[in-house]
Amino acid sequence: MSAVPEYFGSLVFDDRVMKAKLPYDVYVSLKKTMYEGGTLDTAVANAVADAMKEWAVEKGATHYTHWFQPLTGSTAEKHDSFITPSPDGGVIMEFSGKELIRGEPDASSFPSGGLRATFEARGYTAWDPTSHAFIKDKTLCIPTAFCSYGGEALDKKTPLLRSMQALNKQTLRCLLYTSPSP
C-alpha cells in the first residue's frame, strides 16, 4: 500500500503539475490570468489544454467533462472524449484550448427537469482556471461556471466568483482611499 503523501493530490492538475508540464512563459501567463482575471491568449489556452490532456492520459483518462453545480442542487457534467477515430482505423488524441475554455452551447441537455424548450435554453460552461482540474473515474473533470448567453448565472459558482471580484475591487478602493500618501 502506498503512503498517503505519495498519492494525496496525485489526480489534481495543481500548481506542482503545471510547473512541471507547462512551458515557463505559459505557466506565468496562466498564473497571471488566475490572479488578475481576463482572458487567456489562444496559444496559451492550447498549450494548457495539451499539457492537461497529456497529464490526464498518463493517469489513464480517456474522456473529459466540463463539471459544474447548476441551480438544481447537484453536480452536472458534459462528457466528451479525447479520442477521435483516424481514417486509417487508429485514433487521434485531441483536446484544444477552445474545448478547454468553453463547453456545451445548449443548456437543454442539462438536468433542468424539462423546464425550457431547446431554443430557450441557450447557455454555456466556461472554464474557471482558479479551480484545479482533477481526475475522477478516468475522466478529466474541468471545473466551470455555467451561464446563459445573456450573462445570467445558471449555477452556484458564478455568483461566488462575481462576489469575490466585487469584494476585491471595493477592498482595493478602500485601501487606496485610507492608506497614507507616499
Residue spans for each PLM region:
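Short, functional N-terminal and low-complexity linear motifs
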Residues: 1, 19-20, 51, 131-140
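Histidine/acidic residue-rich metal-binding segments in metalloenzymes
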Residues: 3-97, 101-119
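Charge-rich interaction surfaces and accessory domains that mediate macromolecular binding and assembly
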Residues: 119-176
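Conserved small/polar residues in nucleotide/adenosyl-binding loops
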Residues: 177-182
